[in-house]
Amino acid sequence: MDFYRILVICIHVYTRLVFAPLKKDLKLLRLISLCIPIIRPFSFLIYPPPKSFSPLNSILPSILPIIPFAISSSLLFSYTFHVFYRFLFQPLLSVPYANSKQTNCLLVASFVYLPYRSPLPVVIEIMVQRYL
């Protein structure tokens, strides 16, 4: 078998084991996907900041105007993903080992989201919301 079919089989098994139980947590995953654009700018809290660092004076005023745009862009990107899947990728993913919607959706999500380095929970949420 060629590399592409092996990759599709591995992704298919992975989605069956990992993503299938997530159907029950649909509301939680939607909430996570909406919160990620808000939480992401605060990742500086994970790393130790310099001693002269003051988040309220330097970071917070620049983040607040971005939050509504981040939420709206996340929802817009979800719709764009849906259009990409329906009209562009779905006809291309008709190989024998990729006949499940979970597998196809994960492949498309990896192609679409890789350039944007979006966090994985957004991909999982869109998979569950649209196709599972």
Swiss-Prot record:
Spans traversing the lipid bilayer: 28-48, 59-79, 106-126
Entry keywords, A to Z: Membrane, Transmembrane, Transmembrane helix
Record's subcellular location: Membrane
Gene Ontology cellular-component annotations: membrane
Lineage: superkingdom: Eukaryota
Membrane topology: Multi-pass membrane protein
Name under which the protein is recorded: Uncharacterized protein SPCC1840.13
Source species taxonomy: Eukaryota, Fungi, Dikarya, Ascomycota, Taphrinomycotina
